[in-house]
């Protein structure tokens, strides 16, 4: 099942889905290790997403980084058949959540039995 990205204000929970907030600390939500450190208001959405993709790619090189640990955790859920929804404020606009979903799906597809992470 593909990972979905939804707007935190507009998404209605479906039975059995796992919802994970992936944004910055805001409006009572804690900072996610996958929150985008680059703001669209400071250089435009495209630039923020380009910078985020590079940031996440680098973070995933160190399995001990908080971002990598969270992607691994989410990939294990997806590999196990979970219906995962990533929540952010900007969806359905282009969103860093789409980049996270791509990374999670890619890793989940490569995982072995029991959620083992490939070398």
What are these regions (language model features)?
Residues 1-119:
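Catalytic phosphate/metal-binding cores of nucleic-acid and nucleotide-processing enzymes, i.e., regions
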């Amino acid at each position: 099942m593909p990972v979905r990205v939804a707007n935190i204000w507009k998404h209605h929970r479906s039975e059995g889905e796992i919802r994970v907030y992936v944004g910055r600390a805001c409006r009572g939500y804690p900072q996610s290790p996958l929150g985008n450190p680059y703001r669209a208001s400071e250089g435009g959405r495209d630039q923020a997403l380009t910078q985020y993709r590079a940031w996440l790619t680098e973070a995933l090189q160190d399995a001990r980084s908080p971002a990598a640990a969270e992607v691994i955790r989410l990939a294990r859920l997806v590999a196990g058949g979970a219906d995962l929804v990533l929540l952010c404020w900007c969806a359905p606009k282009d969103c860093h959540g789409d980049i996270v979903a791509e990374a999670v799906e890619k890793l989940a597809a490569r995982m072995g039995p029991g959620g083992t992470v490939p070398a």
